[in-house]
Amino acid sequence: MGVSQTLHRISASRNRHGDVCGLTYRVGRHIPGIADSIFDVVAKAASCSSGSLLLVGPPGVGKTTLLRDVTRQLADTFHKLVMVVDPSEEIAGGGDVPHVCMGTARRMLGTPRQSKYEVLEEAVANHGPEVIVVDEIGNAKEVAAIKDIGSRGVTMVATVHGTSLERLLDNSVLSPLVGGKQRMVIGDFAAAQ
């Protein structure tokens, strides 16, 4: 649950009976200009209709903080129609009004019954964005939705948990985000070519 008018979130841990037995408070950060170091990469993603940007890193290293500033750059500097798919209220904060760090980007929360991939599909079907931003891609349905949306010419900007590109490629669910990996056997003649 997002904390209204902030970037912070509170999550409950529950026991097997459904009773709350712990709370986690995540402090969201807005650091204006943090994406300036990758401005050329953001500019390239903004300039091509099939370009996408995937931020990979372990939990807690600042992927979402960077994602917020990339979103602002795409919306305000490059004047793109940016839709932030944010069902967990982690990117743009809690409440009905997105945090000011989003700039002119729009946000979709979805309904409590919708999954993230359903909100992704609704965003492209009903709102015509040039760019869709989403945090923490983690399952096959979300990966399939992202690949489908990207094939329609919408730029995708997303984060995913991982420690390296190599490890991401070894993950059969997430590897399609970076083109995938397939095993091949090549004979001596073909290898010499």
Functional labels for PLM-detected ranges:
Residues 56-59, 109-113, 134-136, 157:
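Glycine- and other small-residue-rich loops at beta-strand/loop junctions that grip anionic moieties
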Residues 66-69, 115-122, 145:
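Well-ordered alpha-helical segments embedded in enzymatic catalytic cores
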Residues 127-190:
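Conserved P-loop NTPase nucleotide-binding/switch module
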Residues 74-123, 169-170:
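P-loop NTPase switch/communication element
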Residues 46-48, 74-77, 99-103, 122-127, ...:
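Conserved catalytic network of the ASCE P-loop NTPase/AAA+ motor domain
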Residues 1-52, 85, 95:
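P-loop NTP-binding catalytic core
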Residues 27, 37-88:
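P-loop NTPase nucleotide-binding module
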Residues 23, 27-37, 97, 106-110, ...:
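Long, charge-dense
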